[in-house]
């Protein structure tokens, strides 16, 4: 689970 700099959540 990661959260990138542009506030896009990747699950």
Swiss-Prot record:
It is an enzyme of class 3 (hydrolase). It catalyses: Endonucleolytic cleavage of DNA to give specific double-stranded fragments with terminal 5'-phosphates. Its EC number is 3.1.21.4. GO terms for biological process: DNA restriction-modification system. Transmembrane segments: none annotated. Keywords: Endonuclease, Hydrolase, Nuclease, Restriction system. GO terms for molecular function: type II site-specific deoxyribonuclease activity. This is Type II restriction enzyme PvuI. It comes from Proteus hauseri. The lineage of its organism: Bacteria, Pseudomonadati, Pseudomonadota, Gammaproteobacteria, Enterobacterales.
């Amino acid at each position: 689970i990661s959260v990138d700099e542009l506030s896009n959540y990747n699950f």
